[in-house]
Amino acid sequence: GDEAAAFDQFKKSADSDLAFVPAIGAFAAALIKKGQFKKARTLIQKTWSLAPHPSLLETYWQTEETADGLARVRSTEQLSKINPSHIESQVARVRAHLAALLWGEARHQLEDIESLNSDALDSRLCRLWAELEEGEHGDMAKAHAWLSRATIVDSQAAWVCGDCGNTIPDWMSNCGHCGGFNTFSWRRPLHVAGLNDQGMPETQNSLAIARPLDVELKSMK
């Protein structure tokens, strides 16, 4: 039937390119639907060594026998060790510790990301910091400061069309904006705070906005 044909197509796409995340995610989800959790885990682990991706983490968690927070932390640690220096492995550990309410370890992981990757701070990490401050201390002032900063730092990675710059959260074969085929790649979109009369980025203005928040947030850590 249609479901069997779709499964075969997912498998063919995954077999042809283990680094093609959309195909791997679709095939892993199909395996999970069939109850083949171990195969799905193995597939994601192979792809994680080549192209870690946040959507694969969500699917990986679905292969677990239990939703227990500590078990999920252990599972995520195993996955992240496959590609330990990649930013997605580091963020995966943060997300697992936050979900398990292990605030101290989550803070330690976030601080490590900042120290190891000077340009890593983006809107996603700001939101994780906000979640930590609200969850650990109930400090809404710090949480709101981080959420404010999320609006002015670089956007988190997304699927970006190489032809027109259209940005979408989930991969599509055709760009809905320009109609390009297979033009999406996973990367950070260009971030422009504003343009001056000459059409150039307002870099001084964006810096003026960012500095008070930088000072405020550093004083709060």
Features from the language model and the residues they span:
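Repeat-based scaffolding regions
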Residues: 1-173, 177, 184-200, 204-221
